[in-house]
């Protein structure tokens, strides 16, 4: 499954600052059972906005992780809650329909 959210930086906080903290938290979160990686994308035309896509074995695995178990992750998420506007886009199943280029 995919968990997708957008983060828009408030004035005075940069995407690069966000990304540094996001990487620190993500490295810890990725130690959780069922974690399959996470990606951070810059939004074209909006230099203060990124989209994160976290990959999990299942919704159950994602729901079972506990961000409060680690003080570093908890502190980073609290900081992001103050410095960014976070919009959850949603939780998505793995793709049912895939078209890839044929070479």
Protein language model regions, located:
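Intrinsically disordered, low-complexity regions enriched in Ser/Pro/Gly/Gln/His and often acidic
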Residues: 14-15, 49, 88-92
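Short amphipathic
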Residues: 6, 92-94
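Short, well-ordered beta-strand segments in beta-rich or mixed alpha/beta enzyme
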Residues: 2-9, 38-70
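An amphipathic, aromatic/His-enriched active-site/gating alpha helix that lines ligand/cofactor pockets
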Residues: 24-36, 55-91
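Short, surface-exposed ligand-recognition loops at beta-strand->loop->(often short) alpha-helix junctions
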Residues: 8-20
């Amino acid at each position: 499954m995919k968990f997708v959210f957008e983060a828009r930086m408030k004035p005075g906080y940069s995407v690069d600052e966000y990304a540094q903290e996001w990487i620190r938290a993500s490295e810890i979160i990725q130690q959780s059972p069922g974690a399959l990686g996470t990606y951070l994308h810059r939004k074209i035309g909006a230099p203060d906005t990124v989209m994160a896509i976290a990959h999990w074995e299942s919704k159950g695995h994602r729901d079972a992780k506990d961000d409060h178990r680690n003080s570093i992750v908890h502190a980073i998420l609290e900081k992001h809650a103050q410095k960014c506007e976070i919009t959850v886009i949603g939780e998505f199943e793995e793709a049912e329909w895939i078209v890839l280029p044929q070479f």
